[in-house]
A protein has these predicted regions:
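Short, flexible loop segments at boundaries between secondary-structure elements
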Residues: 112-123
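Acidic, divalent-metal-coordinating active-site segment for phosphoryl/phosphodiester hydrolysis
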Residues: 146-159
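Hydrophobic side chains within alpha-helical segments
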Residues: 94, 116, 152-154
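Beta-strand segments within the central parallel beta-sheet cores of soluble alpha/beta enzyme folds
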Residues: 110-113, 172
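Short, charged, surface-exposed loops that flank catalytic or proteolytic processing sites
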Residues: 145-148, 167-169
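Acidic two-metal-ion nuclease catalytic site recognized across multiple nuclease folds
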Residues: 1, 156-186
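Conserved non-catalytic scaffold segment of RNase H-like nuclease domains
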Residues: 1-109, 123-124, 130-144
C-alpha cells in the first residue's frame, strides 16, 4: 500500500469534541489524490462558537445528516487504513468523541500526522500551522473548509515524500515495519 492513505479534517461547532459540523477527506492512491469528499454534519448541539472561523452555523447544518448517518460512508476510508490529519490529536479526538456519542466503536487504523511531518521536513518555518505550510508549498487552501484542509494535509505528506524524508519515523508507532508508506528514503 505505498503512498496510499486518507487525509481527514473535522470542523467543530464549539469546544466540545463531539460537535463535528463538517468532515472532509482526501483519498490518496499511488501518490495521487484521487478523490475528495465533504459532508456537513448536524452536531448534537445548537451552540456554534466557532462560526467565525469556518462560517458554518446551526442554520447551515440543521437539516443535514448526523455523524451517525454519514459514518457508514466514511468508515471504509478509515478502517484498517492509514489516516492522516494535520494536528492529528485534534481530529482523532473529534472522531473518537463523536463515535462515542453515537455509541459506535472506533475502528483500528494507522495514523500519520502531517504536523509532525512538516516539523521534521521544514524545520526552518516560523510555525507549522496548516496555513503556513500550505503557503510555503504553494498549496491552494480555503482554510477551515474541511475538504480543502484534508487535501492540503495530503499534499503536505506527498511533498514531504518528494523531499526525501523517511516518513516511517513520524508515522504512529503502531504502524508495522512491513507497511512502509514511501518505500524508505528516496
Amino acid at each position: 500500500m505505498k503512498e496510499s492513505f486518507t487525509a481527514i479534517d473535522f470542523e467543530t461547532a464549539n469546544y466540545q469534541s463531539n460537535s463535528a459540523c463538517q468532515l472532509g477527506i482526501a483519498v490518496v492512491d499511488n501518490g495521487q489524490i484521487i478523490s475528495q469528499k465533504s459532508w456537513f454534519i448536524k452536531p448534537p448541539t445548537k451552540i456554534f462558537t466557532f462560526s467565525y472561523l469556518h462560517g458554518i452555523t446551526y442554520a447551515t447544518v440543521k437539516d443535514q445528516p448526523t455523524f451517525g448517518d454519514i459514518w457508514p460512508q466514511v468508515k471504509p476510508y478509515v478502517t484498517g487504513e492509514i489516516v492522516a490529519a494535520h494536528n492529528a490529536d485534534f481530529d482523532l479526538g473529534v472522531l473518537t468523541a463523536t463515535l462515542a456519542h453515537y455509541r459506535m466503536y472506533v475502528p483500528d487504523f494507522y495514523v500519520i500526522d502531517s504536523l509532525a511531518v512538516a516539523r521534521r521536513t521544514w524545520p526552518h518555518l516560523k510555525n507549522h500551522k496548516l496555513s503556513t505550510v500550505a503557503a510555503h508549498l504553494n498549496i491552494e487552501l480555503n482554510h477551515h473548509e474541511a475538504a480543502s484542509d484534508a487535501k492540503a494535509c495530503a499534499e503536505i505528506i506527498l511533498h514531504a515524500g518528494q523531499q526525501h524524508i523517511e516518513i516511517n519515523r513520524v508515522i504512529n508507532k503502531s504502524l508495522p515495519e512491513s507497511m512502509d508508506l514511501f518505500g524508505g528514503i528516496y
